[in-house]
């Protein structure tokens, strides 16, 4: 199985759907779904996903390289792994999504969207995770969902962690720092993301890794993500990574800006970077007679997007944690 990405993009099913790798067994579970199981018993299970948005190609290329290293035998596998390329049709078309944003659909939220390939795919991925986690006895469950951002950022690499009722494990947060993440953003409310689904339903330690800016296939400079690729390689092979000398800055979400109608106006231009700072009282958005302003001394914006569909998030406002 040395052509997983090509088969996924072409919509082709391989003639052989299971086999042996270097110290592991593999199974093709469907387009964009590949299960890897070490020959030796392990108690760790990992979801490695990318391509939930079809225009975010750098993480897909990173996963393709990791798979090549595993199948060539240059990288040892010490986890049960489910590799997920989330939205094959959008990846093949080079667009963010074909109908609706899949990363708002998980946890059954796909039922509130008009039926489409993306709603069906979200349901398929939910079932795939359920099958994967229920078929093993993993003591440790991780989910790393790799993305790139639409906009540039004051932090080139950062992580977004779902709302969680229990404390985050220190080794997981330390690994995120070792993977080169410059900032971690902690959600305070449930959401429809893939990582919130895996965390809420299966107790996985989950993080959305934002790695640079969205570019087409072949135009990514993967060298700027070497530290992340090296950390992923070390993780898969069971090698402990050194702790980052500069731990990631930490932020938490304090409010969400939502577009409800065509009257919505977001007062941020296309040059506004993620983590741009705004002072207390700054007018951020208006919609009819509703005004959205900064309520803390300073707040930072994440994912500003004035052109989202009505009812969806147009931005998150953050505060820095000590």
From Swiss-Prot:
The keyword Metal-binding applies. The keyword Hydrolase applies. GO terms for molecular function: hydrolase activity, acting on ester bonds; succinylglutamate desuccinylase activity; zinc ion binding. It is an enzyme of class 3 (hydrolase). The active site is at residue 210. It catalyses: N-succinyl-L-glutamate + H2O = L-glutamate + succinate. Pathway: Amino-acid degradation; L-arginine degradation via AST pathway; L-glutamate and succinate from L-arginine: step 5/5. NCBIfam families: arg_catab_astE, PRK05324.1. Belongs to the AspA/AstE family. Succinylglutamate desuccinylase subfamily. This is Succinylglutamate desuccinylase. It comes from Salmonella paratyphi B (strain ATCC BAA-1250 / SPB7).
């Amino acid at each position: 199985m040395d052509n997983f990405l090509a088969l996924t993009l072409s919509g082709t099913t391989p003639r052989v759907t299971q086999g042996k790798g270097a110290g592991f067994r593999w199974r093709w579970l469907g387009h964009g779904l590949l299960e890897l199981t070490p020959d030796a018993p392990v108690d760790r299970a990992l979801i490695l996903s990318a391509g939930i948005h079809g225009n975010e190609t750098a993480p897909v290329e990173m996963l393709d390289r990791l798979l090549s290293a595993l199948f060539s035998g240059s990288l040892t596998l010490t986890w049960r792994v489910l590799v997920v390329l989330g939205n094959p049709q959008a990846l093949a078309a080079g667009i963010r999504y074909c109908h609706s944003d899949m990363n708002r659909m998980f946890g059954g939220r796909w039922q509130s969207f008009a039926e489409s390939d993306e709603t069906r795919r979200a349901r398929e991925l939910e079932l795939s995770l359920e099958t994967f986690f229920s078929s093993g006895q993993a003591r440790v469950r991780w989910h790393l969902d790799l993305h790139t951002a639409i906009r540039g950022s004051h932090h080139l690499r950062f992580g977004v962690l779902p709302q969680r009722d229990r404390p985050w494990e220190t080794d997981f947060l330390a690994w995120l720092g070792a993977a080169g993440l410059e900032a971690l953003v902690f959600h305070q409310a449930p959401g429809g993301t893939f990582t919130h689904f895996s965390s809420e339903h299966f107790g996985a330690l989950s993080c959305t890794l934002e790695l640079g800016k969205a570019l087409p296939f072949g135009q990514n400079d993967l060298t700027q993500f070497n530290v992340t690729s090296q950390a992923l390689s070390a993780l898969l092979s069971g090698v402990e990574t050194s702790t980052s000398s500069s731990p990631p800055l930490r932020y938490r979400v304090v409010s969400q800006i939502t577009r409800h109608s065509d009257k919505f106006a977001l007062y941020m231009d296309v040059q506004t970077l993620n983590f741009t700072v705004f002072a207390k009282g700054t007018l951020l958005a208006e919609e009819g007679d509703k005004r959205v302003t900064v309520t803390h001394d300073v707040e930072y914006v994440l994912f500003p997007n004035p052109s989202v569909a009505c009812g969806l998030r147009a931005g998150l406002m953050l505060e820095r944690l000590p």
